[in-house]
């Protein structure tokens, strides 16, 4: 049995992984899905000062207080920023890292610095016009998301503090010692932001590379297929 811990994506929260809990349990695994400060059921704690380090600390404290060790840490989308920071600071608790259609930062990167210029301009326009100058409005869900999943997800996706995307990550290099896997979801949306990280992972030593015939949120759209893939990674 393996314990998986999720660093979720932007605007999301632990709720988004609801379909995955019984599937991972049926495969003999434990899935832990914390929610970052200021999002989801913790959205009442939102304020302009929340940054990337806040979210990294959220996950670090779950590992510490639950005394979780030998975990597989999953970073989905924005959660790749968080998972990288967590693994670098708590490498002794992590067995391996899985990036699920996620950002893979190097020291000094921020999510905004890794975002193409046209996307970055659109994000900042949304912050100014809809987010009171400090919150990022949610992107639309992928077009292949089922109607019932759109209805379930949309009211739960809340705006995210801008500093979580602005703050550069600080890394000491410990994360580079861990086994890492990249799962690229090949039904990409406009811009295909994650192709750059998938291409890097495919050729770098120390990485395993996988593709899913899925759009950006396979934990919602194809949860069984994702559960099988994660089980295979755990056993490999």
Language model features by range: what are they?
Residues 88, 93-94, 98-139, 193, ...:
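Flexible "cap/lid" loop of the alpha/beta hydrolase fold
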Residues 182-184:
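Short beta-strand/loop motif that positions the catalytic acidic residue
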């Amino acid at each position: 049995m393996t314990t998986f811990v999720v660093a979720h994506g932007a605007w999301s929260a632990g709720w988004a992984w609801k379909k995955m809990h019984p599937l991972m349990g049926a495969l003999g695994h434990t899935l832990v899905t914390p929610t970052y400060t200021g999002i989801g059921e913790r959205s009442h704690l939102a304020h302009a000062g929340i940054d990337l380090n806040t979210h990294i600390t959220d996950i670090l404290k779950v590992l510490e207080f639950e005394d979780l060790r030998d975990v597989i840490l999953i970073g989905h989308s924005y959660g790749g920023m968080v998972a990288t920071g967590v693994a670098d600071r708590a490498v002794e608790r992590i067995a391996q890292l899985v990036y699920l259609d996620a950002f893979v930062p190097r020291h000094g990167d921020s999510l905004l610095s890794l975002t193409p210029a046209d996307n970055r301009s659109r994000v900042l326009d949304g912050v100014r016009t809809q987010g009171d100058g400090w919150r990022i409005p949610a992107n639309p869900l992928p077009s292949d998301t089922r109607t019932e999943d759109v209805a379930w997800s949309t009211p739960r996706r809340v705006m995210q503090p801008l500093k979580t995307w602005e703050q550069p990550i600080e890394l000491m290099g410990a994360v580079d010692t861990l086994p890492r896997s990249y799962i690229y979801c090949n039904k990409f949306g406009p811009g295909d932001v994650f192709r750059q990280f998938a291409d890097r992972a495919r050729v770098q030593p120390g990485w395993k590379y996988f593709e899913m015939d899925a759009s950006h949120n396979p934990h919602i759209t194809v949860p069984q297929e994702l559960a099988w893939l994660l089980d295979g990674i755990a056993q490999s």
